[in-house]
């Protein structure tokens, strides 16, 4: 096993579940779960209709990159949502080839660190900068890619934003990624 795994801390949602085990919310108040972002509502009817219409395709794996139609639709949505005019990303807008659908944020965040680290570079370990508190996937991805995590405090005093001016030049020089929460 990779010895760097020993540096990982307990997953926050497991720790939170243990801390609140046995706690009973007051009977006169509605319980609001603010832990893991699990859906609490039924899917909209149009989603269920689309899923039912697609059941025949569940017997095979989809293309890793998703369908061209899906990637194109996501690219157009990005352009509308973030007002990305033609030429901002590339002439003609966001190319669908720059879009990669994933099953969840952890998968993509983890894979990103693996993709940007050159394992043949034997200099000082690269750094991955992240706010603290942080999403556990940032830390695990950095360690698994052979990088050193650099934690930037995001406290009430800083408006819960990391102070980017406080990042030392030598850290910036070695940083290969910066996760922003």
Each model region followed by its residue ranges:
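Conserved N-terminal helix/loop that builds the PLP phosphate-binding region
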Residues: 1-56, 172
């Amino acid at each position: 096993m990779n010895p760097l795994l020993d540096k990982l801390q307990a997953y926050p949602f497991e720790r939170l579940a243990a801390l609140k085990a046995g706690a009973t919310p007051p009977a006169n108040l509605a319980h609001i779960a603010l832990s893991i972002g699990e859906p609490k509502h039924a899917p909209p009817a149009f989603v269920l209709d689309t899923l039912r219409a697609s059941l025949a395709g569940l017997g095979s794996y989809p293309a890793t990159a998703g369908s061209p139609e899906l990637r194109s639709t996501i690219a157009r949505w990005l352009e509308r949502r973030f007002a990305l005019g033609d030429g901002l990303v590339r002439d003609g807008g966001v190319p669908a080839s720059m879009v990669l659908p994933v099953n969840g944020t952890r998968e993509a965040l983890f894979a990103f660190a693996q993709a940007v680290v050159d394992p043949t570079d034997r200099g000082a370990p690269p750094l991955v900068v992240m706010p603290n508190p942080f999403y556990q996937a940032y830390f695990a991805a950095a360690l698994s890619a052979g990088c050193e995590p650099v934690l930037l405090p995001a406290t009430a005093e800083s408006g819960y934003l990391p102070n980017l001016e406080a990042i030392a030049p030598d850290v910036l020089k070695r940083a290969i990624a910066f996760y922003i929460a």
